[in-house]
Swiss-Prot record:
InterPro entries named among the record's database cross-references: Cbl-indep_Met_Synth_N (IPR013215), Cobalamin-indep_Met_synthase (IPR006276), Met_Synth_C/arc (IPR002629), UROD/MetE-like_sf (IPR038071)
Taxonomic lineage of the native organism: Bacteria, Pseudomonadati, Pseudomonadota, Gammaproteobacteria, Pasteurellales
Record protein name field: 5-methyltetrahydropteroyltriglutamate--homocysteine methyltransferase
Species whose genome carries this gene: Haemophilus influenzae (strain ATCC 51907 / DSM 11121 / KW20 / Rd)
GO term, biological process aspect, one: methionine biosynthetic process
NCBIfam families from the UniProt entry: met_syn_B12ind (TIGR01371), PRK05222.1 (NF003556)
EC identifiers of the protein: 2.1.1.14
Length: 756
């Protein structure tokens, strides 16, 4: 019989119960025990959903209060020494301080989990790091699953991926040298799981889909030789890309099974068809929301079943952390667009799709014929829908003039024209875009969407908020102002609602980091902009002040990366469609007198393929799509872009090729680490490295901000340096926002006087 299993499940709950409970706990409105009880109830629900879908094991250990890599830092005793906490006796408050910072320490750095929109907390390894096992996180969840009478499979990220994802801190050394100390701690943790009755243990090694150095790849042999001495069967899970280049190594490892992502890399199956142990086929897309064509999947699985017999397992391609919880609650979407609804599949539907595949493999297709027929009808309808394909969009792309994505003049000429009218001081200050989204703003938006607030009253509320934001910025003496984005629920969703080819869910939330969830738009058809989206808000904000007002758009690559994207045409084509649609908005802003326009691209690095060999092709089309979004603007219009969570030292030429007049970047959490590359690569345009971390409520000291600004001045000419926070301020409160910005402006004025 074929075994089915799940690699991981969403943590936040069907209605974001965990998020709201966490935030109440942080505000001291919820007792710790109440938070613990809610989390336990969520885990039980998750496991029961998996069991109801006939999964042979439920995944345990994947649930986390903030991040699974932070949990692993605690479990291995590798929490940052600078906090002074005891990992063996860590309180829940201390756990959250690691993630969010406290008055004495900034938060652990956060970055993208491979090429997804989930963020993990980056382990800080020191030469003196002393690992110590604390398996309580996993053991406690196993005990809960056992109490419910469930078959369970613990899930833990493997030692090589864990080390790879970290960074060296302090005295220079290679974190790879810590491996021999880390492995015995893993053995101790695994033994604790075995003592609780674990028969199979899933060890995730997604780093195998990267370009790992030879010594790291070679280390898999010795590491898994040690881990395999544990009295349990190990399932080595890979995902997010192909591991075919390591096929011989993986086939020889002393593990009991191997999981392959056959959605991202279906071609890799050929390299493993002679695998002699359990082969877990990841055939249901774990990162997107499209319904599978189950007949096509069975066409792949049935020959595999004939070869492998009971050694064939089936699963989603990766953890379902990246998909929304349940399609069935999307009643409005079903009423509005029945066809689109029929093409979608969320977490609960995916586990059911897996169950249909399992039944078909074990009992024949006829046993699930109705489900297979429904899957086929949906696939056929999607392939031929006129709602998806709009000939005029393809025509416009095909007929773009040569050089449409290039500015009229080089930066050196443009900046002279821009400076002539901008008349800004040295080290100009600005904000990235958003200001705090207060309860009042959210209430007004929700009331308007429900029809409880008229359009006139809603717009009056937004204008009042915009005026408040403008006045606060004037009081702080900022140089280039923003309107604060009060009218925007989300930097991608807002634009998606106003572009054709997009659809929206009501409950399609996925975790971004900690308690932060996002609700990605669904790009299902060709993209156009039917009417202006932001012009009247920016125009109104500009009417309130004599200072320069910056227009704010989200760029094509970020809209693509932070959406659930159609999978029937290349992503590059979708991205260029968005870029061309945005160019209409940019020209309308310019015509309305908004001549500083920011096109945010925080996700540009996240889109990089995991294998370096594929980078150039991506960077070429991503850069073209970005430049298309401002095609046709005049030289004296200043185009800004913003990037965050990014380590892009290795793609600086591509960033420069975007040819934005000003780039602002997130750098404070990594102590301006990004700027080391500027010593070698003379970035040609203006740049604003973030001088404080907006992900934490902590107000930076003047000394800290000055330290970062001076580091920036060492590598960026003062004439080309801007001063700004790391990112937008949407998630912050007003009190800390004012205090943080005041420190930033005061330090800037001090340095201006010094440099004058």
């Amino acid at each position: 019989m074929t075994t089915s299993h799940i690699l991981g499940f969403p943590r936040v709950g069907a209605k974001r119960e965990l998020k709201f409970a966490q935030e109440r706990y942080w505000r001291k409105e919820l007792a710790e025990q109440d938070l613990l009880d809610l989390a336990k109830a969520l885990r039980e629900k998750n496991w029961k959903h998996q069991a109801a879908a006939n999964a042979d094991f439920v995944a345990v250990g994947d649930f986390t209060f903030y991040d699974h890599i932070l949990d692993l830092q605690v479990a291995t005793g590798a929490i940052p020494a600078r906090f002074g906490f005891d990992s063996q006796n860590l309180t829940l408050d201390q756990y959250f301080q690691l993630a969010r910072g406290n008055k004495d320490q900034f938060a652990i750095e956060m970055t993208k989990w491979f090429d997804t929109n989930y963020h993990y907390l980056v382990p800080e390894f020191q030469k003196s790091t002393a690992f110590k096992a604390n398996p309580a996180h996993y053991v406690n969840q196993i005990r809960e699953a056992k109490a419910l009478g469930l078959n369970f499979k613990p899930v833990i990220v493997g030692p090589l991926t864990f080390l790879w994802l970290g960074k060296e801190k302090g005295e220079a050394f290679n974190r790879f040298d810590l491996l021999n100390q880390l492995v015995p701690v893993y053995v101790e943790i695994l033994n604790a799981l075995v003592a609780e009755g674990a028969e199979w243990i899933q060890i995730d090694e997604p780093a195998l889909a990267l370009d790992l150095p030879a010594e790291w790849v070679e280390a898999y042999k010795s590491v898994y030789t040690e881990l395999s001495k544990v009295n349990a069967k190990l399932l080595l899970a890979t995902y997010f890309g192909s591991v075919a280049e390591h096929a011989e190594l993986l086939k020889a490892l002393p593990v009991a099974g191997l999981h392959l992502d056959l959605v991202r890399a279906p071609e890799q199956l050929a390299a493993f068809e002679d695998y002699s142990k359990v082969l877990s086929a990841g055939v249901i897309e774990g990162r997107n929301i499209w319904r599978a064509n189950l007949n096509k999947v069975l066409d792949v699985l049935e020959p595999l079943k004939a070869k492998l017999g009971e050694r064939l397992w089936i699963a989603p391609s990766c953890s379902l952390l990246h998909t929304p919880f349940d399609l069935e609650v999307e009643v409005q979407l079903k009423e509005k667009n029945t066809a689109l609804y029929s093409w979608l599949s969320f977490t609960l539907q995916k586990v059911e799709e897996l169950n249909v595949l399992k039944q078909a493999l074990n009992n024949g297709r006829a046993s699930v014929q109705a489900a297979l027929d429904a899957s086929q009808v949906a696939a056929d309808a999607r392939a031929t829908s006129k709602e998806i394909h709009r000939p005029e969009v393809a025509e416009r792309l095909a007929n773009l003039p040569k050089g449409a994505d290039q500015r009229k003049s080089p930066f050196a000429e443009r900046i002279v024209k821009q400076n002539a009218w901008l008349n800004l001081p040295l080290l100009p200050t600005t904000n990235i875009g958003s200001f705090p989204q207060t309860t009042e703003i959210r209430h007004a938006r929700a009331s308007f969407k429900k029809g409880e607030l008229s359009l006139a009253d809603y717009e009056a509320a937004m204008k009042k908020e915009i005026e408040y934001v403008v006045r606060r910025q004037e009081e702080l003496d900022l140089d280039v102002l923003v309107h604060g984005e009060a009218e925007r629920n989300d930097m991608v969703e807002y634009f998606g609602e106003l572009l054709d080819g997009f659809a929206f869910t009501k409950f399609g939330w996925v975790q971004s980091y900690g308690s932060r969830c996002v609700k990605p738009p669904v790009i299902y058809g060709d993209v156009t902009r039917p009417e202006p989206m932001t012009v009247r808000w920016s125009q109104y904000a500009q009417s309130l002040t004599n200072r320069v007002m910056k227009g704010m758009l989200t760029g094509p690559v970020t809209i693509l990366q932070w959406s659930f994207v159609r999978n029937d045409i290349p992503r590059s084509t979708v991205c260029k469609q968005i870029g061309v649609a945005l160019s209409d908005e940019v020209l309308d802003l310019e015509a309305a007198g908004i001549k500083v326009i920011q096109i945010d691209e925080p996700a540009i690095r996240e889109g990089l393929p995991l294998k370096r060999a594929d980078w150039d092709a991506y960077l070429q089309w991503a850069g073209e799509a970005f430049r298309l979004s401002s095609m046709g603007v005049q030289d004296d219009t200043q185009i800004h872009t913003h990037m965050c969570y990014s380590e892009f030292n290795d793609i600086l030429p591509a960033i420069a090729a975007l040819d934005a007049d000003v780039i602002t970047i997130e750098t404070s959490r990594s102590d301006m680490e990004l700027l080391t590359a500027f010593a070698d690569f003379k970035y040609p345009n203006d740049i604003g490295p973030g001088v404080y971390d907006i992900h934490s409520p902590r107000v930076p000291t003047a000394t800290e901000v000055e330290h970062l600004l001076r580091k920036a001045l060492n590598v960026i000419p003062k004439e080309r340096l801007w001063v700004n926070p790391d990112c937008g301020l949407k998630t912050r409160g007003w009190t800390e926002t004012i205090d943080q910005l005041k420190v930033m402006v005061d330090v800037t004025k001090k340095l201006r006087a010094e440099l004058a």
